[in-house]
UniProtKB/Swiss-Prot annotation:
Protein's name according to its UniProt entry: Serine/threonine-protein kinase LMTK2
GO BP annotation list: axon guidance; early endosome to late endosome transport; endocytic recycling; nervous system development; neurotrophin TRK receptor signaling pathway; receptor recycling; transferrin transport
Primary gene name: Lmtk2
Catalytic activity: L-seryl-[protein] + ATP = O-phospho-L-seryl-[protein] + ADP + H(+); L-threonyl-[protein] + ATP = O-phospho-L-threonyl-[protein] + ADP + H(+)
Biased composition (Basic and acidic residues): 580-589, 597-608, 1115-1131
Topological relation to the membrane, as annotated: Multi-pass membrane protein
Primary role: Phosphorylates PPP1C, phosphorylase b and CFTR.
Modified residues (Phosphothreonine): 783
Family in the record: Belongs to the protein kinase superfamily. Tyr protein kinase family.
Residue ranges annotated as Cytoplasmic topological domain: 1-10, 63-1471
Species the sequence originates in: Mus musculus
A Pfam family it matches: PK_Tyr_Ser-Thr
Length: 1471
């Protein structure tokens, strides 16, 4: 272009010049030719025009040239400007030519072509993907860092302009530095949190990498506080600082949640927005702005020494080395940051130089920041949070924990006051061991409940956690604020699936927390916490027959509830001893001082326990005082101290609750003592008694076999394995091997000793028992001064000076179960071990037949007098052959003869049943409450130690269950059956006593634990006691069955209406299901069942009066069954549907005469042992009375669950009537009632039930119920593996004994008789306290589980029998609810429709006599045959112990209120 325009002008000029020149030349030519004229004629105009044209042409050419030159220059400048950015990797869509103006302009378009930003666009919002380098305008530089400069700038987005902070990476940064730079902004780029600084964009398309952050108008918080120091005053500013602290912690928690770490957490890196919100971030200018906060290392690195956690700093060869930040170090820095915040942004350790800080803080670690100067509410707590942050790394709280604590403090600071602040604060405080605990809790199903306890939301929470001990089901009540008892010893870790821990009472909780785990024992070998309930094997959900080590462990502490549950009472008492500050080397020692000497120890310890202020019995005396210790607390303490005691005490408490507190207390204490001392003696005696052992062992073996067949028993349930496991459990639970071995002091030992003594004494008193069933206990009571003192004290507090435990207040608590001073005392063996089965009648008078002299109560002979009040027990023991006939007769007699003492005795003895089932049977009938107590204590101890050691222990649990837990089938059945049998004629509700004696839970269980002794027909009790006593007398010559008839109990039972008796047992029995799972013991016992340990089972296998036993079916169905199987199996079978249930038991028993013999023997043994007698008697009473049609309710311990259920139904039905009356006789929250160890075989097999039937006769109702619940659900669990087996419903009365038998087969004899699978079958679960334990297949923890099994067992009529059994089950199921409150309805009723379950349970129990609802509900609730008789959930749910159809789901929230509701508490599915 330049060429052409330039060239044209010259030619034109030339032409013009030529023309001009030509013209000029032409002019002269003419002149030359003509003259000069032509020259002058040349026109000047032409020349002018030529010049002008030339000029115009030149101008045009110049213009053209200039135009061409300008575009060329601009283009070059543009290229030069773009050269700086040519380094970026051109986008794929860009053309290689960067000179194109169009391409240049595309760069200004949003970063479509920029690869780096596109990587983050997906995860960022707003400007993050929109920020472009060209849209940034730098305003000024505000600082610098290792990376480069930090600039304040603006970004233009559309029509808006926003200020931003730009971090620019230096151009010379290495690739590593580039990566570090980008990663430093990643948390802020990804996180979207109001308290985390936002990175709005990254510019990485060109070399100067840029990170664009949001701008906080008020700058960093440190500068703000410095500037606003004068204004930071007053409450509003304090609240602002508190909110800022929470926001800082929240920001860090948000970062940690996504595993981001803060590189330099300090107040200088917390930025404040215009609305005073704090954002945690890092502009990277800290060092440039606050150089004094940093020190430089030898490698030219700077770090904030005063904010750095000590573990990050070290020195090597005089060189400082720093490690990378961790979450733990961030927490340390957080603490320092918060300290700054509360100290006006003062520098930490301002008085120390950097070197001093390095030495004292970092290296020495001997200095911490002082308390902040800021004055604020709970300033100490705020500082405490800071100190948490400065703990060792592994103990520091998580950022979330700090935030939770700060939030709570801030909320509390804004409130005027909160009563529960300290409590809530304690709950919120991080546990230094929480890290380990959380790691061990693999299944914190409900962990958030415990974690997020900012308010009362934690009042009722069921927490399921997997601990090293297994799956823990923890039900936390408000009262039980210590919701986590994981620190306590639990079942074996391999038992995780089945491990259940339900905690209800505060005392129990506290004790559990304070006490060593169930595996810990006092010097006496007894577990201070509720050891009786301890770790109990639960039927394996999947392979019940493998004898796996699954346990349902109700923390002994929590498992024991109010005195309502004999076990709970004992536990409470024990805990109380500790809690009361009467730290005894062994509560069991206190309770059973002579625990090593079963007989003497029983008496001595009983008296001593009563006399010792710290002893659980004295605790009860305190309970009597009721001012020093809450009844539940005491009860729980006793329970926790030792399962035996727990069983004992609750029975006493139950007595007290039932009627006269004195009598009740004494009764409970006695049962307690019995268990602790007597039960130990009993179990030892029983163990050593051939009759007991053979029958117990045989029945146990059968039960175990059945359970194994049903896969209900796990491998650990194998006889020896189970024994060892159980012994280990018991030892772990605080029961020493001595306890395990009857002579030991442990709760188990005491129980065993008591049982042993009881058995020995019954043997010595076998005649006595046979002679005076009424006087047997009385005679025992009076005859065994040694045991009598404590036992009597416990048994007949009013009588014994040591009965302060049974003070008038206590008497009030137990007024319904009030047993005069003639409370049943059991004398075990040669030395009178007063079972202390004070069968508090509805009135002591009733039990007493009016009033019992205190000494009568205290006399072990009088305790043996239980035979009078539980003649059924005596009869059962004595007349095994005539069990059926005797049972109805005895039951009738008991019913006809008002044995107010008998019911109590039954209850207590049933509680003792675990320790001395025979004694429990005798006592159960005669003194239900005492029987229950003794049974419960014995049951717990035995189940853990004694059962491991002896079959007798197994019987004790039955008794205990019957007495302890209405909810638990065993406790409900035995106690209620006894009450029913004894008090059915003289139905007396111990509802008031139930109310007086709280469940031991500080929560709503207070009402629930009321000892709701259900009156049982006196005639029945008498008959049963007499029959049992007679039978026991004859069949237990070697080991005297302790007829636990209080001095006045026996005759009192005769004199007083059965209501007393009912009161006792009901009172004793708590709404707690105690699947006492002496796996090793029962397993061992089943092996011994053939005839090894006569002692092992209260039921004497050798005894021939099964008929007598059969009569005791309802309350002592087990006992009766144990006895009945020999004589009565046929008769039982012949029985009708009610009979049928009875029959089923008998059938189970019938198949094996040995079982029958064994059953009869246990009955004898039980007759020998007050506990078994008590259990047998109440059951027998009920059974005789109610189950004349169904002879051997408890006897169905065979493998046939349906038979067992049917039998139990009949038993329950018979016992339920009185129990219905006395349903209010809330079983003292004895979840520990021995529901467990009721092997399916023992439950279903009458033959195996021989011993267990006696046990269950003791706990006929509870035991049956428990059996039902236990076997139903456990069987259902098994049944899933096998087919649907009529899951044996753990009957209250039957259960303890039956379970006991299952748990403790006699030595070789029992083992020989036990089926091969008996070990597997031996697994049982013991619930202690008002615990609603829903056992379910761990894989399917839903209600559905129970339905299948329940439906499977449709063949039971929902007749009164079914109804009765249903109430039993309800009790068992209501173990918590019923037990807690009134032993009434089930929480299920509200939560689930009872119809399906009821129909199933009805079917299940249809073949069995239905249990009477009164048993389970303090107010006689409508018969819940369906609910009570849990459907056979064999196919559906392994652990549908709760009404499978209604609530198989184990994770059900249980409330005391529900329990208090009595008949309406659905969570009666304790099992």
């Amino acid at each position: 272009m330049p060429g052409p325009p330039a060239s044209p002008p010259p030619p034109m000029l030339l032409l013009l010049l030529l023309l001009t020149v030509g013209c000029a030349r032409a002019a002269p030519l003419p002149q030359t030719g003509a003259g000069e004229v032509p020259v002058v004629e040349v026109p000047s105009l032409f020349v002018i025009l030529s010049v002008c044209s030339l000029l115009i042409l030149i101008v045009l050419i110049a213009n053209c040239v200039s135009c061409c030159k300008d575009p060329e220059i601009d283009f070059k400048e543009f290229e030069d400007n773009f050269d700086d950015e040519i380094d970026f990797t051109p986008p794929a869509e860009d053309t290689p030519s960067i000179q194109s103006p169009a391409e240049v302009f595309t760069l200004s378009v949003p970063n479509i072509s920029l690869p780096a930003p596109s990587q983050f666009q997906a995860s960022v919002e707003g400007l993050k993907s929109q920020v472009a380098r060209h849209s940034l305008n730098y305003i000024q530089e505000i600082g610098s860092g290792w990376f480069g400069k930090v600039l304040l700038g603006e970004t233009y987005t559309g029509t808006s302009v926003a200020r931003v902070i730009v971090k620019e990476l230096k151009v010379s940064a290495s690739p590593k530095e580039q990566d570090t730079f980008l990663k430093s902004g990643e948390p802020y780029y990804i996180l979207q949190h109001p308290n985390v600084l936002q990175c709005v964009g990254q510019c990485v398309e060109a070399i100067p990498y840029l990170l664009v952050f949001e701008f906080c108008d008020l700058g960093d918080l440190k500068a703000y506080l410095h500037n606003e120091q004068e204004h930071v005053r007053g409450d509003s500013q304090t609240m602002l600082l508190q909110r800022m602290a929470c926001e800082i912690a929240a920001g860090l928690a948000a970062m940690h949640k996504l595993h981001f770490l803060h590189s330099d957490l300090a107040l200088r890196n917390c930025y404040l927005t215009s609305d005073l919100n704090v954002k945690v971030g890092d502009y990277g200018i800290g060092f440039s702005r606050y150089k004094e906060d940093y020190i430089e290392t030898d490698d030219k690195k700077v770090f904030p020494l005063r904010w750095t956690a000590p573990e990050l700093v070290t020195s090597f060869q005089d060189r400082l080395l720093t490690a990378d930040q961790t979450k733990y170090s961030n927490i340390w820095s957080l603490g320092v940051t918060l300290w700054e915040l509360f100290n006006n942004a003062a520098q930490p350790y301002a008085n120390l130089s950097d070197l001093d800080v390095l030495n004292q803080v970092i290296r020495e670690r001997d200095m911490k920041l002082p308390k902040p100067q800021l004055e604020q509410p709970y300033s100490d707590r705020w500082y405490e949070v800071l100190q948490f942050c400065w703990l060792p790394p592994d103990k520091r709280p998580a950022a979330e924990d700090v935030h939770r604590l700060l939030t709570y403090l801030r909320m509390q600071s804004q409130r005027d006051s909160e009563v529960d602040f300290e409590q809530q604060w304690t709950a919120l405080k991080p546990d230094t061991n929480s890290r380990d605990a959380s790691s061990s809790a693999a299944f914190p199903i409900l962990d958030h409940f415990a974690r997020d306890r900012l308010g009362r939301e934690m009042e009722e929470v069921l927490t399921v956690t997997e601990t090293s001990q297994g799956l823990s089901f923890e039900y936390v009540w408000e009262a039980a604020k210590h919701d986590h008892f994981d620190e306590q010893g639990r079942g074996h870790p391999d038992e995780a699936l089945s491990y259940s821990s339900m905690f209800f009472p505060v005392e129990v909780f506290e004790n559990s927390l304070s006490d060593p785990g169930p595996g810990k024992q006092d010097d006496s070998g007894q577990e201070v916490p509720v050891r009786a309930p301890g770790v109990v094997p639960v039927f394996d959900a999947h392979n019940l027959s493998v004898g796996s080590d699954y346990y349902i462990q109700l923390e002994e502490k929590s498992s024991s509830n109010l005195g309502l549950d004999p076990p709970a009472l004992l536990t409470t008492e024990v805990d109380k001893l500790e809690r009361a500050g009467a730290e005894e080397p062994r509560t069991e020692e206190d309770f059973f001082q002579s625990s090593a000497h079963p007989k003497e120890a029983s008496s001595t310890e009983d008296s001593r326990a009563t006399s010792i202020p710290g002893s659980p019995f004295n605790l009860f005396s305190d309970l009597d005082k009721a001012d020093d210790l809450p009844s539940h607390q005491k009860i729980f303490d006793l329970m926790e101290l030792n399962g035996v005691q727990a069983d004992f005490k609750p029975a006493i408490l139950s007595s007290s609750l039932d009627d006269p507190k004195d009598t009740c207390q004494s009764d409970k204490e006695k049962p307690h003592k019995l268990l602790d001392q007597g039960p130990l003696c009993l179990s030892e005696s029983l163990l050593h008694q051939d009759h007991f052992d053979p029958l117990s062992v045989q029945e146990l073996s059968e039960n175990f076999l059945f359970l194994q067949e049903k896969n209900l028993l796990k491998g650990s349930l194998t006889t020896k394995e189970q024994v060892s496991d159980l012994q280990t459990e018991l030892k772990n639970a605080g029961f020493t091997s001595a306890l395990l071995e009857s002579p030991q002091r442990g709760s188990e030992s005491s129980e065993l000793e008591f049982l042993e003594n009881t058995l020995d004494f019954p043997l010595s008193q076998g005649d006595t028992r046979g002679q005076n069933e009424g006087a047997g206990v009385r005679r025992h009571s009076g005859t065994s001064p040694q045991a009598s003192p404590a036992l009597l004290t416990e048994e007949g507090s009013p009588t014994a000076p040591t009965d302060p435990i049974l003070k008038p207040e206590e008497t009030k608590s137990f007024r319904d179960v009030r047993v005069p001073e003639d409370s049943i005392c059991l004398e075990l063996g040669p030395d009178p071990v007063t079972v202390g089965v004070e069968i508090p009648a509805t009135d002591a008078k009733t039990l007493d037949g009016g009033n019992r002299p205190p000494d009568v109560t205290c006399q072990s002979k009088e305790a043996l007098s239980l035979t009078n009040r539980h003649p059924i027990l005596v009869n059962d023991i004595t007349a095994q052959g005539s069990v059926e006939s005797c049972l109805p007769e005895s039951r009738q007699d008991l019913q006809n003869e008002p044995f107010s003492e008998d019911p109590l005795s039954v209850s207590s003895l049933e509680k003792h049943s675990e320790a001395a089932e025979t004694l429990n049977q005798l006592n159960s009938k005669a003194a239900p409450e005492d029987a229950a107590l003794a049974s419960a204590l014995s049951s717990d101890s035995t189940s853990q130690d004694s059962l491991l050691e002896d079959s007798l222990s197994t019987p004790i649990p039955t008794s205990e269950q019957s007495v302890e837990t209405p909810d638990s089938l065993d406790s409900v059945d035995v106690r209620e059956a006894l009450l029913e049998s004894l008090g059915s004629h003289t139905p007396r509700k111990l509802l008031p006593p139930d109310k007086p004696a709280d469940s031991g839970y500080e929560t709503e269980n207070l009402e629930s634990p009321e000892w709701t002794l259900h009156p049982a027909p006196e005639g029945t009790a008498d008959s049963d006691a007499a029959a049992a006593g007679d039978s026991g007398h004859s069949s237990l010559p070697p080991n005297p069955v302790i007829v636990i008839s209080d001095a006045g109990d026996g005759h009192r039972g005769a004199e007083g209406p059965p209501q007393s008796f009912t009161l006792g047992p009901q009172s004793s029995y708590r709404d707690s299901a105690y699947f006492s799972d002496n796996d090793s013991e029962p397993d061992k016992k089943p092996e011994e069942v053939p005839g090894t340990s006569a002692n092992a089972l209260v039921l004497v296998k050798g005894q021939s009066p099964p008929e007598s036993v059969v009569p005791e079916e309802s309350s002592d169905v087990r006992e009766g069954c144990l006895e009945a199987p020999q004589d009565k199996p046929d008769q039982s079978r012949v029985s009708t549907l009610q009979n049928s249930c009875h029959s089923e038991l008998q059938e189970t028993l019938q198949p094996t005469p040995a079982d029958a013999s064994r059953e009869s023997c246990p009955v004898n043994d039980e007759a020998s042992s007050p506990l078994s007698l008590l259990n047998s008697e109440p059951s027998s009473c009920d059974d005789l009375d109610t189950q004349e049609d169904r002879p051997c309710t408890l006897a169905s311990t065979g493998t046939n669950t349906n038979e067992l259920l049917a039998y139990m139904s009949s038993t329950l039905d018979k016992s339920l009537p009185s129990h219905l009356e006395s349903s209010k006789l809330k079983e003292p929250d004895i979840e520990g009632k021995y529901l467990g160890k009721l092997c399916v075989s023992g439950m279903l097999d009458l033959s195996e039930d021989g011993m267990d039937a006696d046990e269950e006769d003791e706990n006929s109702d509870d035991s049956d119920e428990d059996l039902r619940a236990f076997n139903l659900h456990s069987l259902s669990s098994e049944s899933e593996d096998d087919t649907e087996h009529p899951v044996p419903i753990i009957v209250s009365n039957d259960d303890g004994r039956h379970l006991r038998s299952l748990l403790k087969p006699s030595a070789a004899e029992a083992i020989e008789q036990l089926p091969e699978d008996w070990k597997k079958e031996k697994k049982a679960v013991t619930f202690f306290d008002d615990v609603t334990v829903y056992l379910f297949d761990q894989e399917t923890p839903t209600k559905e589980l129970g339905h299948c099994g329940g439906e499977a067992h449709g063949p039971g009529p929902s007749s009164p029998a079914a109804s009765s059994s249903s109430p039993y089950l309800g009790r068992c199921m209501n173990s918590e609810s019923s037990t807690d409150e009134e032993g009434g309805g089930f929480e299920w009723d509200d939560d689930f429709s009872p119809d399906p379950f009821m129909s199933k349970t009805t079917s299940l129990l249809g073949s069995k006599p239905s249990l009477q609802t009164s048993k389970y509900f303090s107010p006689p609730p409508p018969a819940r045959s369906a609910e009570q008789s849990w459907p056979h959930v064999s196919p559906c749910s392994r652990f549908s112990i709760s009404p499978a159809n209604i609530a198989s789901f184990s994770l059900t929230h249980l409330t005391d209120s529900d329990i208090e509701q009595g008949g309406s508490s659905e969570d009666g599915d304790k099992d």
